[in-house]
Each structure stands twice: as C-alpha cells, then as structure tokens.
Amino acid sequence: MGTPNPDHVSTRLQRIAKLAEEAPGIAFNTLAHHIDLELLLEAHRRTRKDGAVGVDDQTAKEYAANLEGNLLSLLDRLKSGTYFAPPVRRVHIPKGDGSKTRPIGIPTFEDKVLQRAVAMVLEAVYEQDFLDCSFGFRPGRSAHDALALLRDRALRFGAVVLEVDIQKFFDSLDHGHLRAFLDLRVRDGVIRRVIDKWLKAGVLEEGSVSYPGAGTPQGGVISPLLANVYLHEVVDKWFANEVRPRLHGVAELVRYADDCAPRRRRREAGRMAA
C-alpha cells in the first residue's frame, strides 16, 4: 500500500497557494485533479482516529483495514460525481458555560477524510485571501493568539472592546450567499458539487432524518473553512472597507469564527459616544 508523502503534498499545495497569491482576482476552474490517492492518504493521516462514529457506525480502524482500496473507491466516486454524502449524526454537547448545549454533526469517517482533502486544497487558496483579523480554524492561529492581540492593544493603547457573537451562525448560514462567495475563487465542478452535497446532507437525530435548508453542521471538517469564507465577505471585508474608513482614529476587528471583538481606542470611543 502507498504511504503519504507529506513533503510532496505540501509542495503541491504551496504551488496552489503561490498562484492564488499572485492572482487574487482569478477563480480556479481546475482544482480537483490535486485530489488523488497521495493527497487522500495524507488527508487520512491528518484525520483524527478516535472520534465518534457516524451514521454507518464504521470506525477508523475498520476503514483502515482496506485503506488503499477504500480510498481508491472514494476517489472514483468523487471524480465521477457518484459520491453520496451521508447524513451526519447530531449530538448535543454542553457549551463552555454549562447552561446550554451546542449541536454537533458527526460525519462518517470516510466523509471526514474527503472533507479534510477538500479543505486542504481550498485552504491553499483562501489562506492567501483571509485577513489578519481572522483567527478561528486557521493554520498557525488560535484563540490564544486572538486574546493575546486584544490584551496587547488594550495594555498599550487603552481600548473599548465590544464582543459580538453571531447567534446560531452555523445553523443559519445562507447557502445561496455562500455559493456566490465561493464563485469568486472556486468554480471547479467536482469540488463545488461535493460541497453542495455536504450542504444538502441530512441530519440524523433521535432516529429521524431532516434536511435543513440553511447552515453547515458544526463538527464537519469542511464547515469551519466554509464559515470563514462566508464571514470573510460579510464581516471582515465589510469592516475593513466600509466601517474603518468612516471612523476617526484607530479601530480593529478581531474575529474567531463567529465571535467578533471590534476594538477602538478608549479616548476615541468616548468621543463617539458623546
């Protein structure tokens, strides 16, 4: 069986990133050819093996028993358009404050691998576009980095920080708007079809399957990237291009997924309030 070559995969993804950086206005019509057995093997290597099982009850160990055969079958179904996105299994986990729960959609293990592969390719494109204010679910960035930036600015300059949480964002994300935003950079038919299948996939909860017309399930590997694509257009670029130029003095946006913290220097914020 073939083994993943992380260095070779990384080099290929870097080529995509370089082209995306050099041509920020182009939309990629051909990206799916980068998803081959080698990249799927690397996607499998990067996928957690100890997560909860999806609707098919297949474990990572069971899938790995015939790994190359399973991945070749997956690749054929992806490229031929016959890949079926199975429903996600919905569970509810407590939020950090313990007062509420958060719905999490658990894909099948194979779906996790394919989502990881597609996310790797798309990430190479979108990491060249995303703004520095975005910290959530991005390589080399974390919630700690976002908090460190807020703390640094507050200590150095003094600031008024407004915390904003977009209510039920992952449940209400508009599919039509997302497709329009994806059109700006990614028009590859194979990749766009499988993303549509994930968006339309059912949700299994308490024995029944529903088909939500909006949102992208938290828990899916691809969901955070799609959320960042959406919020890049409606929040980050809006703040940079529309809000900041209208303000006097310094204002910054720090965003971690659907949690935002616009910041203004204390003196200037007070002047606005007056």
Please annotate each region the language model reported:
Residues 1-57, 61-68, 72:
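Non-catalytic, polymerase-adjacent accessory regions of viral genome-replication enzymes
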Residues 36-39, 51, 67-71, 122, ...:
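Short alpha-helix boundary/capping elements
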Residues 61, 97-99:
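Intrinsically disordered, low-complexity linear regions
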Residues 77-92, 100, 121, 129-274:
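Conserved polymerase palm-domain catalytic core
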Residues 103-108:
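Conserved phosphate-binding loops in nucleotide/dinucleotide-binding enzymes
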Residues 111:
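Short loop/hinge segments at the start of secondary-structure elements
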Residues 115:
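"…together with the soluble PPM/PP2C metallo-phosphatase catalytic core" -> "…together
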Residues 118:
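Nucleotide/phosphate-binding loop and acidic/charged catalytic motifs
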